[in-house]
Amino acid sequence: MTPLSSPLRQYWQTVVERLPEGFTETSLSAQAKSVLTFSDFALDSVIAHPEWLAELESASPQADEWRHYAGWLQEALADVCDDASLMRELRLFRRRIMVRIAWAQALSRVEDETILQQLSHLAETLIVGARDWLYAACCREWGTPCNPQGVPQPLLILGMGKLGGGELNFSSDIDLIFAWPEHGTTQGGRRELDNAQFFTRLGQRLIKALDQPTMDGFVYRVDMRLRPFGDSGPLVLSFAALEDYYQEQGRDWERYAMVKARIMGDNNDAWSRELRAMLRPFVFRRYIDFSVIQSLRNMKGMIAREVRRRGLKDNIKLGAGGIREIEFIVQVFQLIRGGREPSLQSRSLLPTLNAITALHLLPENDVTQLRAAYLFLRRLENLLQSINDEQTQTLPADDLNRARLAWGMNTDNWPQLVGKLTEHMANVRRVFNELIGDDEADTPQEEELSEPWREVWQDTLQEGDSTPVLAHLADEDRRQLLTLIADFRKELDKRPIGPRGRQVLDQLMPRLLDDVCSREDAAVTLSRITPLLAGIVTRTTYLELLSEFPGALKHLIMLCAASPMIASQLARYPLLLDELLDPGTLYQPTATNAYRDELRQYLLRVPEEDEEQQLEALRQFKQAQLLRIAAADIAGTLSVMKVSDHLTWLAEAMIDAVVQQAWMQMVARYGQPTHLDERQGRGFAVVGYGKLGGWELGYSSDLDLIFLHDCPIDVMTNGEREIDGRQFYLRLAQRIMHLFSTRTSSGILYEVDARLRPSGAAGMLVTSADAFADYQQHEAWTWEHQALVRARVVYGDPQLTSQFDAVRRTIMTTARDGKTLQTEVREMREKMRSHLGNKHRDRFDIKADEGGITDIEFIAQYLVLRYAHEKPKLTRWSDNVRILELLAQNGIMDEHEAQALTVAYTTLRDELHHLALQELPGHVAQTCFSKERALVQASWRKWLVAV
């Protein structure tokens, strides 16, 4: 055992003052002194439970004691009679064993590989013990879940990630997936439940037993987001549902996650064998699959961007050469060749490294270095976390904890530890780059830059000076450019730029100027880029990104030249620079139906309980996707319709995630309304109106939303803080509004307008579906029925969606007096024009003026309300383009007119998109779009001017 260093001997005196009664400095062994000095977690635990210290002093922890965990826990739970006492015993048992593991680890009494095994067995023992106790309790209450043949059905739990691999770290979340074999009902209970309901309730109670903080702490933070469909999917799935999902919808990243999946408490029974056999083909392909390398490279890029976004430094898990890169190296071989090589199918990393050596897939020396680095990094990670039982992989900045880690890693001091760490991580990084690499080299050779460009940047030539590299510019442009450079350098003098930042900037700027000054619009482009550079000069990471990745710099210049809106976004949110690294994704937005899944994967990296990080992640994802959509728009790869489609799908993914987050927060506080006990879903819907409802969102569009529920009047919630069910939905809607509008360092998510709800701003924020139907039928104005034409459910249960669709269809197919409707629609349009019309009389407001977009929308809405009672098919779509198609198909409007209005509509909307990209208002010269305006005005007179 390494003697305590001087700082630790000094700290021991603080420890002595806190020792539990009955223990003195002289009565403790040297081992106890060392552990209690090293770990505040161990010290706090034995102060609360002195008998644990006596137990450790009399009998040190053993390497194989994990074999006794199940028996010890069974004894601890013998007298448990309710959920509260179960939760207490689970927490005390976990803490007691964790102190024993911390003791053995700090003193190196047990090998590091065995420590990982002990931590994983402890978690598995607690999960299985809690499940079995709660399963029996639920069976007593509701009966035993059985299939149609009367065979009892178990709850199977997949442990994912390091838990599944038997490599859990000291303070870790646990990633779980719940499954049960076959559908059926419970038998022998006081009331019969569907198996899905039984296992959902059991799963909820199990999560609460493990995850909910009490005065005794918690057992483990439980993360269920790896299950199919994430938080929006069922908590527990049948085998059939699991199989369907992974066969038809399983993503690459889910396949990688499933490599480590292991059934908790697996006793190799028929159900366990069936589940394993079902999942194996999804994970391990029969053919050699080299697409894995690019997929893993993409995942690594996502992690590198996350490190930059969160400002993570000294992170031994996610940093270059860290634990995650070793895991990626091993997964490459598992996923490429695992289908053909059973020895590569191990869930654990170290046995897989042995197989890689045996199969000669990597040089033996590389594998030796990876093994040594992995064990070194995992020991360092566990020691770091055992100091305070805290989930962290970031090296400490304070002297005490650095001294603790140096002692725990058997080094003389902190610099010696850092030296060893640096060597191990460099070895890992080398193997990683050779195998997976990045799309561009980490350190590309410095381009040869001519001396004149350095002169332009570093010497700040005077306006009268001449240099050949600027000779192609007109005199005024040259003066403007040199003034911009001089002003930028003056601005930099006010910033606290360190030596490294200055060095990188001096490498970057000559290259940037070389590219910018080759453009005709050099001064304009530079004026858009310098605010961004001024914002990141103190964040060397982003300067290095632009310096080391010439492609990223090229795309930055091109996009800023094309759009001041993009330049402004990049200046406000520099984290978006990461998106410039991969042109393959930059100019190809996410598939319209994949936004939800991309967002779900993105949010998995953020702790579920960290609301602040969740809010930031949502905003960062939205900004990154907006950048990609705008880049594709500028490049001409997206039509105006496709731009709006992408913006709308993105907004819907955001709504989905915000509702999920708000729901989880509300249920944690109040439980859920009891009318949901007997059914699936949440009894809640979000209806999109206006541009969202009509699939016509622009870059800066608000969201027009209303909220519906189907909660009966007398329902309460089932949580410890019981509230009225309808009050629950009101607070849910308020929470959703809050999550959208909260301003973080990444801005707000969307401006949300809920004034289209029944009775407008004076009405309730959330309305029951029945009240909504009654309002629409008996109180709503014609303009509210017009708004309903462009409305659709963007989030909600199928039951509520059907209810809303039926109300909408009923209202729209109601027979109306043509003259009255014509007058009311026309008068509403005139009223709008007087309030919103263009204040610049010499300009044409594309949206609000006569012959503009709003006129086309009113024509479409009028014709649907006028003729839907005769042609119900007119109610099918909520977007103007398809409504115009329906009007032609149903003989209301001739095909030529419908096509002409569609072309005018898309042309005007395209112009609005491009004006937004240029940060210009939505009006143009009066001479513009005269053909389109004349056509729209003629159509307006035809349909809406009284004869």
From Swiss-Prot:
Chain positions covered by the region annotation Adenylyl removase: 1-440
Molecular functions (GO terms): [glutamate-ammonia-ligase] adenylyltransferase activity; [glutamine synthetase]-adenylyl-L-tyrosine phosphorylase activity; ATP binding; magnesium ion binding
E.C. code: 2.7.7.89, 2.7.7.42
Cofactor or coenzyme needed: Mg(2+)
Keywords carried by this UniProt record: ATP-binding, Magnesium, Multifunctional enzyme, Nucleotide-binding, Nucleotidyltransferase, Transferase
Residue spans crossing the bilayer: none
GO process terms (BP): regulation of glutamine family amino acid metabolic process
Region annotation (Adenylyl transferase) ranges: 450-947
Cellular compartments per GO CC: cytosol
Keyword Nucleotide-binding: yes
Catalyzed reactions: [glutamine synthetase]-O(4)-(5'-adenylyl)-L-tyrosine + phosphate = [glutamine synthetase]-L-tyrosine + ADP; [glutamine synthetase]-L-tyrosine + ATP = [glutamine synthetase]-O(4)-(5'-adenylyl)-L-tyrosine + diphosphate
Function in brief: Involved in the regulation of glutamine synthetase GlnA, a key enzyme in the process to assimilate ammonia. When cellular nitrogen levels are high, the C-terminal adenylyl transferase (AT) inactivates GlnA by covalent transfer of an adenylyl group from ATP to specific tyrosine residue of GlnA, thus reducing its activity. Conversely, when nitrogen levels are low, the N-terminal adenylyl removase (AR) activates GlnA by removing the adenylyl group by phosphorolysis, increasing its activity.
Family assignment from sequence similarity: Belongs to the GlnE family.
Name the UniProt record assigns to this protein: Bifunctional glutamine synthetase adenylyltransferase/adenylyl-removing enzyme
Originating organism: Salmonella arizonae (strain ATCC BAA-731 / CDC346-86 / RSK2980)
